[in-house]
């Protein structure tokens, strides 16, 4: 193979890898975190937003106490969001509130009012079908 072609193949492989081709969130194991309250009672939790998965994918909070969720975007190229819209449980993080791109950090605040398990997901294109989902557990 000529040297120029080998360089092109290597560059194409690197680009596809960087774009997350072939990545599936369904193969990522479930990880869990319990939100930590500060002195004022606000529960804090950090969720990393990767290529087609959230880490942790299971977040545990207490009902009736405010939650500050920090979303840390860990992907350079593909935009994502975190959507969790359950008005009956006091949780409303819509597509635009949880939208981010290009290594940004975003904070969303809500006060869950009712215990239960509430799914969250990425509402961009087919990301949810690729396994970009999680669960907010309210105790």
Placement of each model-derived feature along the sequence:
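Bacterial N-terminal signal peptides that target proteins for export
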Residues: 1-10
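C-terminal motif of bacterial Sec signal peptides marking the signal peptidase cleavage site
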Residues: 17-20
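Extracellular/periplasmic metallocenter environments
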Residues: 23-34, 53, 100-139
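N-terminal edge beta-strand
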Residues: 32, 37-66
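N-terminal post-signal-peptidase region of extra-cytosolic proteins
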Residues: 49-57, 68, 92-95, 103-105
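Beta-strand cores of secreted/periplasmic/IMS beta-sandwich domains, seen most often
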Residues: 57-78, 105-114, 118, 138
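Beta-strand signatures of extracellular beta-sandwich domains
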Residues: 81-85
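Short edge-strand/loop segments of extracellular domains
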Residues: 86-92, 138-139
């Amino acid at each position: 193979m000529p040297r120029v072609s080998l360089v092109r193949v290597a560059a194409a492989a690197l680009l596809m890898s960087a774009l997350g081709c072939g990545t599936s969130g369904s193969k990522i194991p479930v990880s869990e975190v319990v939100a930590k309250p500060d002195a004022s009672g606000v529960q804090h939790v950090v969720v990393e937003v990767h290529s087609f998965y959230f880490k942790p994918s299971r977040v545990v909070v207490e009902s009736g106490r405010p939650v500050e969720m920090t979303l840390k975007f860990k992907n350079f190229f593909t935009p994502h969001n975190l959507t969790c819209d359950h008005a009956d449980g006091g949780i409303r993080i819509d597509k635009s509130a949880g939208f981010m791109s290009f290594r940004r950090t975003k904070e969303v605040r809500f006060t869950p009012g009712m215990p239960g398990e509430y799914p969250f997901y990425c509402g961009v294109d087919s990301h949810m079908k690729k396994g970009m989902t999680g669960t907010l557990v309210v105790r």
